[in-house]
Design a protein with these regions (language model features):
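Basic, Gly/Ser/Thr-rich N-terminal segments that form RNA-phosphate-binding interfaces in CRISPR RAMP
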Residues: 1-268
């Protein structure tokens, strides 16, 4: 549709974003501003609503193809002598991964696949989560922990691949926080420079919108030392349940039910 806009009444064309639009462009490159060049909160919310409605452009057919491609790639690794363990993870509620990835105009944080723009759990996050749990349950300076995760001098023996949607699109959920005492939090933040303002009931809540996901993800671990890949998988299963992945785990986000798939350990 068309509508008059601007001080001269110029006509602008308004159309709904396609569900096939690139989420990498929309969430990482687009800056929605008003006629004064100021970032527009309403347009930012519209981008987030598009992400929820379109599921970040996830195509069931393409997801199936990517899953098949990964299966073939893992089969090649097995043929080369690698051990491969395949896991399936499902959030107990919602998952907030990549909220700190705010290198975009509207500071929308979410981990996205670098090619397709789908939600993922980065392999680096899975490795860090597993290493944190391993450190809790192992002796200090454990040789197994050092071998599996590496050190400053040597890389680890197990590779944690990015977790991708497990055969079907993940559900994208637009969530919201409502901090009630923003002046207090702002004035007491490091380097605020001003006098602290006490929290008070007359402070208005300030809604903060962010994206979360739910649904099954495929987790894959590979390595040449079978026992070490198995150990990493066991630690990851426990870490997902005990520590949770991503942000806001103290609020119930990120806890994962991780299970092993039936035919995962064939290797050459």
């Amino acid at each position: 549709m068309s509508a008059p806009a601007g001080p001269l009444g110029k006509v602008i064309r308004i159309s709904e974003l396609s569900g096939e639009a690139s989420s990498l462009i929309l969430l990482r490159r687009v800056a929605a501003v008003d006629r004064h060049g100021v970032l527009d909160d309403k347009s930012e919310l519209a981008l987030l609503q598009w992400a929820e409605k379109s599921r970040l452009g996830q195509s069931p057919e393409l997801i199936q193809r990517v899953a098949q491609r990964r299966t073939r790639a893992l089969a090649e690794l097995r043929a080369l002598g690698h051990t491969v363990i395949r896991l399936r993870a499902e959030p107990e509620w919602r998952l907030a991964v990549g909220l700190g990835n705010r290198a975009n105009p509207h500071e929308i944080g979410m981990s996205l696949h670098g090619t397709y723009g789908w939600p993922i759990i980065p392999g680096s996050s899975l490795k860090g989560l597993t290493a944190a749990w391993a450190a809790q349950v192992s002796e200090p300076g454990s040789g197994a922990v050092i071998r599996i995760f590496g050190s400053t001098d040597k890389r680890g023996s197990v590779r944690f691949l990015d977790a991708i949607p497990a055969g079907e699109p993940a559900t994208v959920v637009l969530d919201v926080l409502t901090p009630h005492h923003q002046p207090y939090y702002t004035s007491t933040a490091p380097k605020s420079g001003g006098a602290p303002r006490p929290p008070a009931e007359h402070h208005n809540p300030v809604p903060v919108h962010f994206l979360t996901v739910t649904g099954a993800f495929a987790l894959d671990l590979t390595g040449r030392v079978t026992n070490e890949v198995r150990q990493a998988a066991e630690w990851l299963i426990d870490a997902g349940d005990e520590l949770g992945a991503g942000a806001k785990t103290t609020s119930g986000y990120g806890y994962l039910k991780v299970s092993r798939l039936g035919d995962e350990e064939r290797h050459g």
